[in-house]
């Protein structure tokens, strides 16, 4: 399974086109098979090329940001932009960087400790029914997250007070400690324990958030599930993750979809499969039957002489294409012919006459054997 293309190129998700191009050129030179003969270099070179192919094109990159690999691959798992479906920025991928354990994530990249810091991304697993995945719709979710403190407006300082330079590190954010050893003196530099590397301390902490600047809250969100999503689809909801620190932007919310199985239907890409049991007479003579589809009842023609396991097609009754719901797959129905194990005397008489007409011997194997043979003529 492909990894995260941003990680492959070593750039952040907000990298511009020039940054992506520079990263690609640097890595392409490093891993080009003509230059690098180490095992795995050629495969790495292919990954780099694929990542650049996706991230260098704005439209493809947008789909990747929304659906991850599924948004840029073929078939029924292509990406879908929900930016036009409400206030949410966009939407998945199966596995990607930036998540830690539980609902929180790791901050991306190393930033100045006293500068604005982007909030963590959050992950939520959401269960959908088979029908919800096919046709989409709105779902209400509840998300525990860190929200910017309204009392101190995220500063962590008590209203009316501010911050001052840390007296321990004099604003440097680091402290230096010398250690004497038999081999000489060594200097060890570490983050200031007083200001945690920010270089500043709050004069008086905000009582509402205890000086943190953020509070744990649970919020309700309504998200739009587009038609045609599949098990493992990732929806990205922009800026609905944890609030940032010191004026930094909020992280994103990633919703991973888990689709329940259905007792009647099986999904294969954009197609839906199901079985239909018919009697041997219906298979021999043909008929029209009502069958279940995801859209409700539909009429299906069973041609005369239909063989067991014949697959019949109901066009445009399958899964809508992700991002273009006007295009749909088909519903493929496998015909299962029921051959009776017991028949009454009247049925036997009629079948014996039929066997005589066809010139079939039905002594060996009985009439049941004769019936089975009818479907292979």
From Swiss-Prot:
Q: Select a single GO molecular function from the record's annotations and give it.
A: ATP binding
Describe where the CXXCXGXG motif repeats fall, as residue ranges on this chain.
149-156, 166-173, 192-199, 206-213
Q: Where does Zn(2+) 1 bind?
A: 149, 152, 206, 209
Gene3D superfamilies found in the cross-reference section: DnaJ domain, Heat shock protein DnaJ, cysteine-rich domain, Urease metallochaperone UreE, N-terminal domain
The family database entries (CDD domains) matched by this protein are listed as: DnaJ (cd06257), DnaJ_C (cd10747), DnaJ_zf (cd10719)
Q: What is the free-text note on the cofactor?
A: Binds 2 Zn(2+) ions per monomer.
Question: Where is the protein localized?
Answer: Cytoplasm
GO CC annotation: cytoplasm
Q: Which Pfam families match?
A: DnaJ, DnaJ_C, DnaJ_CXXCXGXG
| Essential cofactor(s) | Zn(2+)
Sites binding Zn(2+) 2 sit at 166, 169, 192, 195
GO biological process terms, semicolon-separated: chaperone cofactor-dependent protein refolding; DNA replication; protein refolding; response to heat
| Keywords, sorted A to Z | Chaperone, Cytoplasm, DNA replication, Metal-binding, Repeat, Stress response, Zinc, Zinc-finger
The primary site where this protein sits is cytoplasm
Q: Which stretches are zinc fingers (CR-type)? A: 136-218
Question: Which InterPro entries does the UniProt record give?
Answer: DnaJ, DnaJ_C, DnaJ_domain, HSP40/DnaJ_pept-bd, HSP_DnaJ_Cys-rich_dom, HSP_DnaJ_Cys-rich_dom_sf, J_dom_sf
Q: In what residue span(s) does the J domain sit?
A: 4-68
Q: How does it assemble?
A: Homodimer.
UniProt function note: Participates actively in the response to hyperosmotic and heat shock by preventing the aggregation of stress-denatured proteins and by disaggregating proteins, also in an autonomous, DnaK-independent fashion. Unfolded proteins bind initially to DnaJ; upon interaction with the DnaJ-bound protein, DnaK hydrolyzes its bound ATP, resulting in the formation of a stable complex. GrpE releases ADP from DnaK; ATP binding to DnaK triggers the release of the substrate protein, thus completing the reaction cycle.
Q: What is known of its domains?
A: The J domain is necessary and sufficient to stimulate DnaK ATPase activity. Zinc center 1 plays an important role in the autonomous, DnaK-independent chaperone activity of DnaJ. Zinc center 2 is essential for interaction with DnaK and for DnaJ activity.
Q: Which family does it belong to?
A: Belongs to the DnaJ family.
Name the UniProt record assigns to this protein: Chaperone protein DnaJ 1
The species this protein belongs to is Synechocystis sp. (strain ATCC 27184 / PCC 6803 / Kazusa)
């Amino acid at each position: 399974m492909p990894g995260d293309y941003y990680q492959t190129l070593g750039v952040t998700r907000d990298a511009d086109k020039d940054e992506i191009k520079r990263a690609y050129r640097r890595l392409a030179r490093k891993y080009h098979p003509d230059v690098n003969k180490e095992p795995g270099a050629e495969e790495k070179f292919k990954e780099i090329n694929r990542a650049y192919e996706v991230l260098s094109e704005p439209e493809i990159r947008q789909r990747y940001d929304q659906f991850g690999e599924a948004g840029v691959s073929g078939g029924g798992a292509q990406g879908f932009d929900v930016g036009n479906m409400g206030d949410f920025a966009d939407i998945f991928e199966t596995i990607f960087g930036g998540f830690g354990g539980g609902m929180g994530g790791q901050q991306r990249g190393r930033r100045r400790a006293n500068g604005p810091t982007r909030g963590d991304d959050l992950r939520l697993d959401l269960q959908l029914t088979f029908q919800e995945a096919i046709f989409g719709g709105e779902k209400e979710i509840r998300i525990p997250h860190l929200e910017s403190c309204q009392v101190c407006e995220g500063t962590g300082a008590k209203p009316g007070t501010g911050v001052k330079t840390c007296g321990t590190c004099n604003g440097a954010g680091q402290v230096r400690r010398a250690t004497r050893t038999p081999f000489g003196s060594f200097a060890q530099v570490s983050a200031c324990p007083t200001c945690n590397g920010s270089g500043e301390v709050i004069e008086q902490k905000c009582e509402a958030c205890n000086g943190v600047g953020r509070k744990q809250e649970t919020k309700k969100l309504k998200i739009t599930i587009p038609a045609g999503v599949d098990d493992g689809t990732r929806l990205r909801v922009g800026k609905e993750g944890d609030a940032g620190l010191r004026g930094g932007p909020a992280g994103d919310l990633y919703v991973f979809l888990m689709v329940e199985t259905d007792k009647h239907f099986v999904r294969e890409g954009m197609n839906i499969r199901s079985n239909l049991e018919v009697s041997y007479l219906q298979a021999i003579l043909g008929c029209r039957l009502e069958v279940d589809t995801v859209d409700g009842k539909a009429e299906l023609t069973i041609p005369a002489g239909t063989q067991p396991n014949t697959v019949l097609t109901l066009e445009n009754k399958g899964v809508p294409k992700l991002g273009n719901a006007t295009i749909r797959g088909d519903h493929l129905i496998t015909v299962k012919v029921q051959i009776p194990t017991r028949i009454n005397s009247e049925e036997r008489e009629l079948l014996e006459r039929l066997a005589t007409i066809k010139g079939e011997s039905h002594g060996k194997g009985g009439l049941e054997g004769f019936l089975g043979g009818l479907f292979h003529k």
